[in-house]
Amino acid sequence: MELTPEQKKWSSKRRQDVSATCLRSILIEQKGKCALSGVDLLFDVAEGTPKAGGRGCHPLYPAVDHIDPGNPHGGHQIVCYALNDLKGHLPFDCFEALKVTAAWKSLMAKWREQSMKDRADRESF
């Protein structure tokens, strides 16, 4: 997979202590998709830079996720900003249990559906 100019720009600097080289490798491995939902990530910098008093990051903007938080060797993945936020607010064991439920699978199917329908509609995610 060849990275788009937007993906190259996003992955050109270290994030969450992950090197640019590693970020590019993860992006290629994930084919530019969220590791949790399978949705194409939105690499538009304007959508990922919150403005004071304005809207925050777009739910589909990429975020570096520690697969196993607290484990320095737990690895990284790139996920949707909103899903990374959700994961960060739950205990790790709880999130892992949630991922295998029918409700989670249904939610991820709806995310993929909405992403194909109208990814610009932030409130639908």
PLM regions: where:
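Contiguous alpha-helical segments
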Residues: 1-43, 71-75, 86, 92-113, ...
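Histidine-centered nuclease catalytic patch
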Residues: 36-79, 87
